[in-house]
Amino acid sequence: GEQDAAVLYTTAQSSNVCIAFLQRDAENRWKVCQSIEGLADTVDNVRLAQLQDGGSMQMVVGYLASQGDSYLAVYSYENGQVSAILEQSYEQYLVEDITGGGNQDLILMSTLEDGGVQIELLTVDRDGSFQQVAVMGLSADKFSGCASVAAGLGADGKRYLVLDGWTGISGNNLATVLLRFDEESQQMIPADQISTSELYSASLRNVPNLVSRDLDGDGTVEIPTQPDEAGLLNMSQSRRMDFIVWMDYTSPTPEKSFGLLDEETNCYIELPAEWEGNLLLTDSTEIDAAVELRTVDENELVLTLRLVSASASAAGWTRLGVVASRQMQAKLGEGAVITDQTYRLSRSLYRLN
């Protein structure tokens, strides 16, 4: 029931960061119980996690070496004794109850020598023992590294892991892998709802920072896609925008959100789903630095978007929010038809930072 403390510090005698673990003595003074040397000269992140039974917490420390390599260490601290239960290089990691066992699990991503991605799971097995399992690898012919990892609940109530990997000739494109924890094999396996190859093709996208995320805060991680049929683009090259469809492939109706991505401000503007497939995005000829959405079949103006100074008046416009220190405003066209009663233009802006 007593709180302990951990202090990260450097000394002239060590090139790496050190960690001291402290407890209060009988006179309520802090006393160093044990000190250990870390794995590099810089600490990138620190967090506590409950990875084991018994109520004790583990400390997860991400280190960044001067040459740019990242290392992860997991320290177990009980009764004044510290032990390192994991020390290895990594690219991305996630602490989440992905197995559904009640404790948090550690999912670790690292790049193999051949360029593929290895996924490791640190969890408590059925016998209560702490184990590290190499759950699967992503082949080097498809992926060259890990961009991001997220976890969430699927539409079926199961826990899923969503991995975005670098791919393409340049290595700057993204594609997604969807995994779930299998109770019988105690391993992460590909999701049943869509094949790995189908998901790779569907999720292939050319925006490096467009990663999977829980877009609407419902606990499910949505996967962004750039389908050609979502809409047409006819605008200047100075403004990078594209139509995006966010998908939940664990659901029998996978499409969650349709809208417009503004790469310049890294924001997403949700649009009525009924507009998908019948939109043309073009520069406005009437309003400076604005863009218009028009119907493909009738060239009807349905929405105008513009970026103005944060203090500009929004009279006659709907203020969506402030992005990149500027105000995003929108105005529906006179011929715009929205049958979806749940859609609200004023709540359509999502910041993707």
Regions found by a protein language model. Name each.
Residues 231, 312-339:
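Extracytosolic low-complexity repeat regions of secreted or lipid-anchored proteins
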